[in-house]
Amino acid sequence: MDFHLTEGQVTVRELAGGVFGRHGDAQHLAEVEAGEDRFDRRLWRDLADAGVLGLTVPAEYDGAGLGLSEVALALTEQGRRVCLVPLWETVVLGALALVRYGTDKQRSTWLPRVADGSAVLAAALEDPGAGRPWAPRVRATGSDDGWTLTGTGTAVPYAHVADAVLVPASTEAGSVELFLVETGQAGVVRARYERTDRGVAADLVLDAAPAERLGDGLDEDRLDWLLQRAWVGLAAIQLGVSQESVRQTAGYLSQRHQFGVPLATFQAAAHQAANCHIDTQAMEVTFWNALWRLETGRPAAAAVHVAKWWSAEGGDRVARTVQHLHGGIGADVTYPIHRYMLWASQLANTLGSAGWHLHQIGRHIAGGTA
């Protein structure tokens, strides 16, 4: 088995890393966080110009026609630089679903705009009151005039700037389908608030809001298809966050002296840093296993939950440890390492906590599908 990236994947990683790197200095990140939208639109334009936003968009819609692996590499680079742009939301949650399930009209309407950066997409996949993401509380009502949705999509990332949001909803027939809701319509209210990572999310309050069903509908298996890719995308970002925070901490421990010697020579500090490295290695191998299974059509459900569990558990542990290893300066909320802790905490609890995913792993073990 060849574990090396292809030449094309290396190119994507280097391209995305270069673009994010030009916008990832601490001063610029702080300026974006102080802005009204918490959305780096200059970076978004550069990502579009570089072709990163069109990675999964088919060539006939002005994209590169690549897969989830290439997007995951770009997401990892975003995590390294903790840049506030809706790459996961637009490309994974939005474009992938449109490519897979959208009608020709839906694809021609949205995919070229995704590729050129003129459209932002999001998805309302958080539904804490439902107990499980496969049973959404938003209700869809069909009529001769089309579909309308009523209910609230909770904590929708970047909904405040999204042109359209994908919303899973339960129909009167008892099925679960995915709908596309344009945010500028009547019956749509966005109640925004700041997230832990200093970005912005919004509750999407729908009151008989006009909606368009995605393709021919979305049953539970198809919703699971989208959720699995969403979880792997989150694991990709968290991997970048953790790897970069460990790298920065290693540099700090080597440069910072105490009692005339580098902190890295202290066994207690070295052991904690080594544990962080082990966590990131476990995060990486489980992430790639889940991604490989998804890309090759193998059973992936249990592997995806394992990857997301490591992303949540390991990522949060790494974030808190590296902040502790920075000593007093780690408590400074303006110091760069603090931003990585905030991102790790946000990612760890997005679309299910470590405990929730551990429960799903247990279900797969008990059911013989792990």
Functional labels for PLM-detected ranges:
Residues D2-E14, R80, V188-Q281:
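Glycine-rich beta->alpha junctions and the first turn(s) of the following alpha-helix
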Residues V85-D104:
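N-terminal glycine-rich flavin-associated loop
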Residues V138-G142:
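A structural signal for short hydrophobic beta-strand segments in well-ordered beta-sheet cores
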Residues A124, T152-V188:
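A short core secondary-structure module
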Residues Q27-G35, A250, S254-P262, H277-W310, ...:
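C-terminal helix-coil-helix/basic helical segment that borders enzyme active sites and/or dimer interfaces
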Residues D2, V12-R13, G328-A370:
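Glycine-rich phosphate/cofactor-binding loops in nucleotide/flavin-utilizing enzymes
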Residues G117-P128:
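A short, Trp-centered hydrophobic/proline-enriched beta-strand micro-motif
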Residues M1-V85, R363-A370:
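Amphipathic, small/basic residue-rich leader segments at the start of a protein or domain
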